[in-house]
Amino acid sequence: MSKGKKLIAYVGCNHVANFEGGGISVFEVSEDGSSLTLISSVKDKPKRAGYLTYAPKAKVLYSVDERKTDGRGPIKPASCVLSFKVDPESGQLTFLNSQRTVGAMPASVAVHEDKKLLFTANHAFFDHVVKAVETADGRWVEKFEYDDSTVVQYGLAEDGSIGDVQDVFVFTGHGIDPWAESPQGGGHAPASPHAHIVVVDPSGKYLVVCEKAAERVYVFRIGSRLELASVYQCPLGTGPRHAAFDKKGCMFMTCEFASELWSFDFDASSGALRFIDKQSTLSGFKGRNEPATLQIHPNGRFVYMNNRGEDTIVWFSISPDGHLKKAGKVSVSKSPDPKDATRAMTLSPSGAFLLVPDRPADVLRSYAVGPNDGSLKVLKEVPIQNPVFIQFVEL
């Protein structure tokens, strides 16, 4: 971090009924991660803050509000994506505006500042409705309908506030249903699509979306509308969830159903993915496990991911050609269920430390990162209610 700069960590928190929490908390963080100081918070919106991203030119923070709109003329807040102006001196947040997400349970958000575009992946809920349908031959049958899972493209105004919806892609297909090996959705999680991540590739030409039910990775060309460039079909039982790129353009992906980490070569001329390697994220654990997020170290030598179930953070070394080798792990607080586990973590811009929102323990914890072996050593813990996601900003 440059001399005189201030490092801010924005922590998205989920509100839990009958407890405090929710909103976005603002921490000032020392360069080495040994000091975490709460300086302000936005509690009223979003109540179910999750994924965050930052537009440095506009100095605007974006957040999803992880919920399903409760019906026409909603009584509770609607499913939405929100924008906040970041004070360049203090890092405090001022609400700008919000837009509906055109889909339930927004899981992630990505910004393309040069093209003034914002994207959300809307996961959709697991619940279904049962419709009574009369067939052409006069029989009455049950029809099962699910939420649409979508990726939505918005325009951005000059001040970074969120404009109108420009395009929506509705995912189709399903995986194994019912699937006894996955208790998600009562064994029906793959019954309908669930998009989990949107990420812009390093070239700025493509948007990558992982959809875990039909086991697909979608690549869209970025423009005035979402143009499908390629689709990578994973084997059944994979569950592509989270993806990230290194500086060379290799893509890494966690697999929620298979408990694996994959690596790909990404062709920036066509948007095609070429599989390189995969490794198990587990070390003998036999219970239910669902990998979540991943982070790539700025030096490009290590990738970190977290297991929900085994409740660990695992890091892998990355060879020059993209192959993976498990290098170590640390435990985080035990969760009663993978859906309630620690689900995210974020490396500092310099890579000196990793910041983890340990959800079951209600703490924010920093780990020093070993520069040579990627190892993690606890530095500091501070209390915070139900933390979910972290976004660093240098001011």
Report the location of each language-model feature.
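Short loop/turn segments immediately following beta-strands, especially the blade-tip
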Residues: 26-34, 84-91, 153-164, 220-226, ...
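Short, conserved, GDST-rich strand-edge loop motifs in beta-rich repeat architectures
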Residues: 11-18, 64-77, 120-146
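Beta-rich, blade/repeat-based domains predominating
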Residues: 46-56, 102-113, 132-133, 140-145, ...
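An edge-strand/N-cap motif at the start of beta-rich repeat modules
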Residues: 1-31
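Blade-loop segments of beta-propeller domains
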Residues: 37-115, 332
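Beta-propeller fold detector
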Residues: 36-43, 93-100, 162-181, 228-232, ...
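Short loop/turn segments immediately following the C-termini of beta-strands
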Residues: 14-16, 66-68, 123-125, 156, ...
